[in-house]
Amino acid sequence: MSDSVILRSVKKFGEENHAFESDGSHNNDKKSRLQDKMKEGDIRVGFFELFRFSSSKDIWLMLMGGVCALLHGMAQPGILIIFGIMTDIFIKYDIERQELEIPGKACVNNTIVWINSSFHQNMTNGTVCGLVDIESEMIKFSGIYAGVGMTVLILGYFQIRLWVITGARQIRRMRKIYFRRIMRMEIGWFDCTSVGELNSRFADDIEKINDAIADQLAHFLQRMSTAMCGLLLGFYRGWKLTLVILAVSPLIGIGAAVIGLSIAKFTELELKAYAKAGSIADEVLSSIRTVAAFGGENKEVERYEKNLVFAQRWGIWKGMVMGFFTGYMWCLIFFCYALAFWYGSTLVLDEEEYTPGTLVQIFLCVILAAMNIGHASSCLEIFSTGCSAATNIFQTIDRQPVIDCMSGDGYKLDRIKGEIEFHNVTFHYPSRPDVKILDNLSMVIKPGETTALVGSSGAGKSTALQLIQRFYDPCEGMVTLDGHDIRSLNIRWLRDQIGIVEQEPVLFSTTIAENIRFGREDATMEDIVQAAKDANAYNFIMALPQQFDTLVGEGGGQMSGGQKQRVAIARALIRNPKILLLDMATSALDNESEARVQEALNKIQHGHTIISVAHRLSTVRAADVIIGFEHGVAVERGTHEELLERKGVYFMLVTLQSQGDNAHKETSIMGKDATEGGTLERTFSRGSYRDSLRASIRQRSKSQLSLLTHDPPLAVADHKSSYKDSKDNDVLVEEVEPAPVRRILKYNIPEWHYILVGSLSAAINGAVTPIYSLLFSQLLGTFSLLDKEQQRSEIHSMCLFFVILGCVSIFTQFLQGYTFAKSGELLTKRLRKFGFKAMLGQDIGWFDDLRNNPGVLTTRLATDASQVQGATGSQVGMMVNSFTNIIAALLIAFFFSWKLSLIITIFFPFLALSGAVQTKMLTGFASQDKQALEKAGQITSEALSNIRTVAGIGVEGRFIKAFEVELQTSYKTAVRKANIYGLCFAFSQGIAFLANSAAYRYGGYLIAYEGLGFSHVFRVVSSVALSATAVGRTFSYTPSYAKAKISAARFFQLLDRKPPINVYSEAGEKWDNFQGKIDFIDCKFTYPSRPDIQVLNGLSVSVNPGQTLAFVGSSGCGKSTSIQLLERFYDPDQGTVMIDGHDSKKVNIQFLRSNIGIVSQEPVLFDCSIMDNIKYGDNTKEISVERAIAAAKQAQLHDFVMSLPEKYETNVGIQGSQLSRGEKQRIAIARAIVRDPKILLLDEATSALDTESEKTVQTALDKAREGRTCIVIAHRLSTIQNSDIIAVVSQGVVIEKGTHEKLMAQKGAYYKLVITGAPIS
């Protein structure tokens, strides 16, 4: 067979298809398009763009809700007309009363006259009297107030209900579209986008958009309606005074504009900082076992806190700016008061253009307008925050994916042979444009043949497979299928023709049957059973208690590596693909499993094009064609024998792997003894239900989720059993009681001086309003004075007091804004930090709980800490403000008329009842809403963390359906909330009018029969009315308050939990001369999440200092569990693990783990530089660069790193995604070496490496093992045969132990294990 690479001609569907142009212009255009899209744009979302997802029904709901809000807003200006008329009547009545109290005056013929004066004098100076029946007038006005109150009740209910419902509908649609758009994105986009950041956007940012388009907008419309009607009425009743009052309005407008722009900018910066912190939290929680193994808890808390400090800084600036401009606007409003009364009194007293009632009408209308503009400005912060939050969301939604995996475009071939050809393909990853992966690659893969791709790590083998799946498009050249450029083919159809089995299989948290059905949605149960049989998975599945309905756990964490791999193969086989891609498909398997899986793969070779990437040459040897890769180029092609004769790349790899052994002899041994493997199914296939959670130490590099989290199955499929199981598991969602506020505030104690100053400032601000009502009623009373000079003098005094109030307000409002922003942001940072630290301090068994998977925990960190501010921070200031307002107002009211005050305060319990009901109901709704969104967050986390698998098997649509089901639950909760919230809000608004109605009715009686002054009636009514408004305003905080108590309860539940294995504890034994002697004594163990499955059943084995102990046995026998017990991820249920004669349960955990290093098969790297990842090996002290480089050299890593453009500062990407497996492994080994441990744990440390890398890494490991106690888990004999002790484990018990020679001589289980399955070199 020729070893040259042939470039065949290409069939074109049409000349207009630019995909076939050879100059690469199309590719360059795509590349530039991608780069343009990936750039962080300066696009800002306009407010009205937030409603882009509204339907016609939503528009009608918003229109009706808007009309209700506008009509509601007109109620207050409308009632001021009545108030003005009432004021004139009161003043006339009071003047008449004062005149009649003068000795010598009497009312004659409705005129007050001097009894002894002449008729002419009396006609000139007489005052009309006896025409005002004050009580009957008050009855009439009382009826009008009551009517307006009932109208407000109705309008307020529909105003809130309609806006909350339409907001929920639009947010539901936005979440759907956002998730759908993300699921359409090409893989290159995910390389440049943090999954943790996306989860934060789902959890936090969309919630901020909801705040901007729901009930807050209703409040804004209501307030603006009040403001506009007030202004119009003011101009109608007296344009001169209105213009004077409005003279300062441009300054108010400027203030509002500055607030909006500043808040938007600070919010954007704050959100970016929180998103970065969220990304770190997601990465760390997903890699919790690596963090625990290397003692990185405190280091990760510090890394997380650094980003919180940035967010805190911007939050404080936001509070300062808000406080200053709020004070600035209140100052202008009080200056307006002074100016209005000074000039208005001139128009009343000197020019007599206005009556006092008209003056009051104009003044109150314009001031009411100004105040409502001020209140509406607080909504601007929410709107600005919503727009800032929407920027990233909408950029993603509007971005057109370069490769749209759900597009209907492209051709579908009627028949497919399966011939694949690479034509001069050059490629680099979008996230690393400076590193060329494929360099002018050309090769042909013939239909129906098995083609093996071999080469060193980083040569481009796996990249070639990703191009075939069209995860990426070539930068230059093209890939063709049966002569057609794959870019011209429908991408969904293309991926349906391809089956993929990877080294690190991703299973989804549902049943085994549903995981296999992911391969083909319309598969019947018979198809699933057959696929399982073909993958040699049927027997182990049927041995499980629930068989095909067994839940696999998060990421397949409930299963061993071999079991997961066989389920993944079944999933690929059920598709009956024309092309099968095997990317290290059997490297993670033990010998027995590999043999069975290889047998399954051999069954389906006929009629399929198979492309295999493998490092075990025993797997490669049987291929029809082998293509050797080197530096992104296919350098040789041929059969096993042809390439050996050529003595090129392949020959070198074979030579390295065989280590001088005769490959043909190895094959004959396998053929001779393979028949003996039949007995091993019974001996080794049982044991633990999973391979002692192999994933506990080695994480999937592609997954952000912890493999040990056992979640209920997500409803990602239509299959009834899966969905039912999901529902049944809902009962496991833990309810929490709302946290007491005093405990929340206890966490703010370090900021007590800020809270004290802020509370004093808030108290002063709260007292300002009652003082204003006192001054206002006093000013009204001056108009009934008989002496005009006295009137002027008192009015000028009142105006001076208003100026003083304005000056005080600007100072105290700034202090309130700054101090509570400071205390609130520090609390948020503290809670996030404490929460994150508490999470990292939990025992590993806690993470096994379905309620604590990384997606849920990250969501809680993102939302709960910020929501706690609903009961602290600026909310405390608002509450103190309202409380002081109420107390001061009641004191003033009871001082001037206790009888009238009592009548009005009768209405207070109704307000309190309304608020209590609202708080109670909304607390429940907040909890339900959070549960629904956490389940939705779990779905998004699983889908996005495993996006390559999701895209490869084409199940985006199923995740989208599951996500939308959870959104529907959240929507139903919102609808129920709308009704309760609307009723409570309406009641709190309408009750004030009803209270006024009763007050004026009884006030009229007190004036008529008990001689109460009308100014006292105004004083009492306005004071209590304002305090009632404060009560209503307090209850408007109840939604935030309800959320805050639930969120705080979750935090306290976490902080209060005492983990059985406490990593932060200083207790426990430590000793200087740590030797590394290990004894497992009769250890029995079951995982907390699976108490019915016995994993270890009396394991006993010892290893002396400096010796190497190798654990061998079939998948699932409990090998890796022993490592976890040694690391104290868990403690044995019975028995003891002894370290140097000390019971591990009594040893200090940090001390124990600091003396243990681990290298696992699937190493977890962090999203930072290579240097930082190496230094992570020892977090107890600062590692020098020289020491890290020395470790890299020992791990055979240094030369590779120095070839990179940024060398040791090269970022490895999320979970090391920018590196090949071999490169990641060598970094992990360097990390372990730099730790200099006394005990070294090697869990399949070289199985993921290519032959060349394995040789160098094994040399490094052999050197690292010197002088250390070492425990090795491996499937390759070459790795373990030189061990001092080899322990054969079956069903959680050591059944044989000894040296290699001793065990082979016994011809027992070890002997059978060696000769069964894939050849062991």
From Swiss-Prot:
Membrane topology: Multi-pass membrane protein
Top-rank taxon, per record: Eukaryota
Xref: InterPro entries: AAA+_ATPase (IPR003593), ABC1_TM_dom (IPR011527), ABC1_TM_sf (IPR036640), ABC_transporter-like_ATP-bd (IPR003439), ABC_transporter-like_CS (IPR017871), P-loop_NTPase (IPR027417), Type_1_exporter (IPR039421)
Chief place where the protein resides: membrane
Residues that bear Phosphothreonine: 586
Topology feature Extracellular, residues: 84-147, 237-240, 341-353, 777-794, 1001-1011
Tissues where this protein is expressed: Expressed predominantly, if not exclusively in the liver, where it was further localized to the canalicular microvilli and to subcanalicular vesicles of the hepatocytes by in situ.
Annotated ATP 1 binding sites: 455-462
Pfam families, A to Z: ABC_membrane (PF00664), ABC_tran (PF00005)
Ranges for domain ABC transporter: 420-656, 1078-1316
Sorted UniProt keywords: ATP-binding, Cell membrane, Endosome, Glycoprotein, Lipid transport, Membrane, Nucleotide-binding, Phosphoprotein, Repeat, Translocase, Transmembrane, Transmembrane helix, Transport, Ubl conjugation
Activity regulation, free text: The uptake of taurocholate is inhibited by taurolithocholate sulfate with an IC(50) of 52.9 uM. Pravastatin competitively inhibits the transport of taurocholic acid. Cyclosporin A, glibenclamide, rifampicin and troglitazonestrongly competitively inhibit the transport activity of taurocholate. The canalicular transport activity of taurocholate is strongly dependent on canalicular membrane cholesterol content. The uptake of taurocholate is increased by short- and medium-chain fatty acids. Cholesterol increases transport capacity of taurocholate without affecting the affinity for the substrate.
Enzyme class, spelled out: translocase
GO term, biological process aspect, one: bile acid metabolic process
Coiled coil region boundaries: none
Family of the protein in this entry: Belongs to the ABC transporter superfamily. ABCB family. Multidrug resistance exporter (TC 3.A.1.201) subfamily.
The protein's name: Bile salt export pump
Gene that encodes the chain: Abcb11
